[in-house]
C-alpha cells in the first residue's frame, strides 16, 4: 500500500495533502501523557473561574472594542471577529450580554452554528491591556426591534443580535500578548481595572487585590518562557 501511494505521488496522481498521516512517534494520545508534560496548575489558577458579570468585570467589557466569538455546529468549529467602538458589547445584568451582528460577508457561519448548538465562547480584548477575558455561555439570536434600535452604529441597525447567557468567565494572563508584542507602544487605558481588581471581584475571597497587583508583573516576567 505504501509503495503504491508513493508511486502515485511521484506520478502526480495525488498530492501531499491527500496522503494519509504518518504515525507520530512523539504524539500525545492520552490525558496521562499530556498532564505529565506540564506542571500542576496552582490553586489560584484552578479557582479563578467566576459565574457572573460583576461591576468591575463590566468595566473591562465596556472598554473593549474587539472580541473573538467561538461557535460549533454540524459544519465544524468557527471563530469570528467582532468589533465596534468600545462598549458595543452590552452588559444587561450579571448573567447576560448582548452582541450586535453587523454587516459582513453573509456566510453567517457563527449564526448557523448557534441554531444547532447554542454554546459559545468569547475572548474579550482591550487594546493596551495585556489581560483578556474569557466568557462561556449559551446564545440565542434575536431581531427584537427595540434592541436593534438601541444598538445603532453609523446610522445603521444591526441585522440581528446575540443574547448571551453567561455560565462562566475568567481572566487570562498577559503572557501571550506580551510575547506577541501586540500592544507594544500603546498605553494601558486609564481606569481599566487591574488583574488583581478583576480576579478579586470575580471570585471573592480568592485573592487580595493590592497584594496580587504588587506581585503580578514580576510573576509574569519570570514565567514568560
Label for each model-derived stretch:
Residues 2-225:
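Binding-site signature for planar aromatic cofactors or substrates
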Amino acid at each position: 500500500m505504501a509503495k503504491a501511494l508513493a508511486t502515485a505521488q511521484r506520478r502526480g496522481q495525488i498530492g501531499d495533502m491527500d496522503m494519509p498521516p504518518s504515525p507520530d512517534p512523539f504524539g500525545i494520545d492520552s490525558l496521562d501523557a499530556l498532564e505529565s508534560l506540564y506542571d500542576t496548575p496552582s490553586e489560584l489558577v484552578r479557582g479563578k473561574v467566576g459565574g457572573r458579570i460583576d461591576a468591575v468585570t463590566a468595566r473591562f467589557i465596556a472598554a473593549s472594542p474587539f472580541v473573538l466569538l467561538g461557535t460549533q455546529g454540524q459544519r465544524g468549529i468557527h471563530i469570528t471577529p467582532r468589533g465596534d467602538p468600545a462598549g458595543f458589547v452590552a452588559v444587561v445584568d450579571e448573567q447576560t450580554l448582548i452582541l450586535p451582528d453587523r454587516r459582513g460577508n453573509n456566510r453567517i457561519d457563527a449564526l448557523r452554528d448557534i441554531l444547532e448548538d447554542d454554546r459559545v465562547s468569547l475572548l474579550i480584548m482591550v487594546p493596551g491591556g495585556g489581560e483578556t477575558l474569557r466568557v462561556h455561555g449559551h446564545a440565542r439570536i434575536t431581531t427584537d426591534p427595540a434592541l436593534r434600535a438601541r444598538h445603532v452604529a453609523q446610522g445603521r441597525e444591526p441585522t440581528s443580535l446575540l443574547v448571551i447567557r453567561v455560565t462562566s468567565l475568567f481572566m487570562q494572563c498577559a503572557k501571550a500578548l506580551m510575547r506577541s508584542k501586540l500592544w507594544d507602544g500603546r498605553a494601558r487605558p486609564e481606569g481599566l481595572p487591574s488583574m488583581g481588581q478583576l480576579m478579586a471581584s470575580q471570585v471573592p475571597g480568592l485573592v487580595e487585590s493590592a497584594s496580587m497587583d504588587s506581585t503580578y508583573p514580576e510573576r509574569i516576567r519570570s514565567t514568560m518562557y
